[in-house]
Amino acid sequence: MDFDEVLREVGSFGLYQKVIICSVLLPAALPCAFHAYSQLFIAATPQHFCRVPELEPWTQDYVQLVKNLSIPRNRNGAYAECSMYSRNYTDIVRYLEYRPPPDLLRQQAEDLLKLQPDTTQVVPCQHGWHYDKSIYSSTVVQEWNLVCDRSFLVTLALVVFGVGGLLGNYVFGYLVDLWGRRPSFYAYLLLEIIACAASAFAWNYYTWLGLRFVVGLTVPAILASPYVLAIELVGPERRVFCTIVSNIAYSLGLVVLAGVIYIVRDWRELSLAVSMPLLMLFSCFFVLPESPRWLMAVGKTRRAIKILKVMARVNGVRVNRDFVERLQRKLVITRAAETKSSMTTHYGILDLFRGPNMRRKTLIITLIWFANTSVYVGLSYYAPALGGDEIWNFFLAGAVELPTYLLLWPGLSYFGRRWILFISMLVGGVACVATFLYPDITLLLYCVGKMGISSSFVVLPLMASELYPTVVRGLGMSFSSVISMVGPIVIPMINHMGQQMLVLPLIVMGALLILGGFASLLLPETRNRNLPQTLEEGEAVPLSFLLCCCVESERKPNNIRASPKKRILPEAGTPVFHRVDTPVSDRVPCKIVCSICKNEMRTL
């Protein structure tokens, strides 16, 4: 049974859907943004230098003096963060005790540095570190000294968070079909709030790491649940709208998170600030309906009909008296057909790779999905490392997404999916790579790259859902999205490698985007096309192969003969047409076969 027909009878986008989406589903996008990226500031690394116990009395008031006495400089002239001078600081302390403050400020330790100019050795920090608290009053890095040879533990926390997301995305696919959309969402939300709030009371790094893993388990589910519910409550003509609005809500969550971080600078307080207010979402538990589409799919017809009646009443639609009878009759027929089909056909992941066209489309979609997820998460993680005000950079990273979605909305309706996906990824990739040539405008190029990846991140799931056949659509979407979650595991390591070369992660992410952009040209356009229902229909839709000859030939009349020209051998890589005459008569039609996509066209 086509549920979209049922929605048209009760109102596919009326007051009921608008109230649910605006009051519940859009605010529900905030937890994902909060918990996915608050860790960047909970585990922020402030400026630091080696602690020298003998110079401790002067550290607070004469920081520059203490650094000159104890800290060497790097090649770029900055003070080292992981090394110090090995000196007899007892003699220096005796000298400092008898110097008045004005003399100390004036001399800047020039005389003291001459005491041991040749014999001074540089050694790693021996007694811990002093941290700059002008930006953050406290972070996990400060509390557990996750710097220097322990700095990789910060990256490890992001990797573990990504592993949790990978597993959570896999488990959520089962729970959402087993429990339903609403119970799954609130179960994950409760687990997320408890784990994030508990991490504020962690007593060591590994306890905090384990709790962040649990938070990572819930983030994909929290992100997917509002989107799935919104899509299933509206008609097909409003799904692009729901996709855009859902992403706008997510970007607003990033902007709001930047404001929360600006106010709360202690990591324990920040963990509570991004978790406890989300308990207010439970006040909507009895307002948010279960998906009637899912209820019908699992045979809970009475609950589905009850929700549909409420939907019709709120939307101001009067349904016919025989509405319930017709609906139940359709359900019986549909269930019998599905039972018969399930007895003969079972689909698995291998079905995505049986036919050559489906295999290629699955691999291309998965590659592009991996590139999108990796670069989007990577650029969001990279924002605080751009230099300058870290919180302002993160605010910009979220704010630049908002105008992108407003421009994308009409573009998807008038220009299609394929070219918008290609242009978005190409522009974003070129902007990221260009930071190597124009380092002075890295922030501007970063914003352009973020706008590009934000656009493609919206288009790809929509295009993928229109390319996978109905019988394996959910399976194909899950497969591609799960594989793409490897990106958030790998990308923190690339960002960690970029500590010595700031633009290195941007170059890697830009190259990945460009590769995915050109791969998107191999996919066929899906705008205004009927969705494939079976594997055979999906296999019959050929790849596009950039500017395939078959696409151009559709615009030309078949009965016009080209004027005879001198025969020229085609260049390598260009499509070649093979004429295959049938030996029936001299006037029979012939087949023109494209050598690239193997699509046959009949002409005179």
From Swiss-Prot:
Keywords from the UniProt entry: Amino-acid transport, Cell membrane, Glycoprotein, Membrane, Transmembrane, Transmembrane helix, Transport
Main location: membrane
Locations listed in the record: Cell membrane
GO biological process: beta-alanine transport; histamine biosynthetic process
Membrane protein topology class: Multi-pass membrane protein
Glycan attachment points: 68, 88
Pfam families (UniProt xref): Sugar_tr
One function term, GO molecular function aspect: beta-alanine transmembrane transporter activity
GO cellular component term of the entry, any: plasma membrane
SUPFAM superfamilies in the record: MFS general substrate transporter
Tissue expression from the record: Expressed in the head and predominantly in the retinal pigment cells of the compound eye.
InterPro entries reported in the protein's UniProt record: MFS_dom, MFS_sugar_transport-like, MFS_trans_sf
Keyword Cell membrane part of the UniProt annotation: yes
Family: Belongs to the major facilitator (TC 2.A.1) superfamily. Organic cation transporter (TC 2.A.1.19) family.
Protein known as: Beta-alanine transporter
Gene of this entry: Balat
